[in-house]
Amino acid sequence: MQLFFHYNRIMNQKDILIYPTYFPSISHYIAMIDAKTVTFEVEDTFQKQTNRNRMYIYSPNGIQLLNISVKHDSANTNFKDIKIDNQHNWQKNHFKSLEAAYKNSPFYEYFIDDLRPLFEKKHEFMLDLNFEVFELVNDALGISIPFEKTTEYFHEVSNKTDFRYLVNGKKDATQIEPYTQVFDDKHGFINNLSILDLLFNEGRYAVDYLKQHSL
């Protein structure tokens, strides 16, 4: 049975198109870890109120949005040209929020020192930050996800499964199996947060958890 499941999973693997985001949602990682190939969309125009520059965590008061302010000259600015507004001390605020949310989680101390340097340096471009985040999370999970980048933008694609919609949390209806969260005794299980929530609570068991899901 296990061999059949493994074979069936390989046969169903997809070539996917997806956005690089800031500490991606769990659904993002379900899509990527289950993919045959991953291509990141980098030729799009920037859109506000998406996960390109935000993540959601589980704070003592429930769900919390962590947003990075960005600078853009027009509504048609390419995302790869979007600069971070470093006048706002987002690094300090985000790190303190992560500490308040996860310092009592099982794996916070194990991973936080590897993540800390990210919040101690200033990045110029949002896209560069997102790719550094991607590599950091992969290292923490103990996985490697090879990827390519787009060279031009297409509104519709026929040769890949288009998961770009996942960048918009309002359009992402993914439901995942509950796992233990720090404050679930107060607020219950909160679905599909940042991959950091799964990492701090499940450690490298998170990889097995992700592989139990598919989109």
Describe the predicted segments one by one.
Residues 2-215:
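Residues lining hydrophobic/aromatic ligand-binding pockets adjacent to catalytic sites
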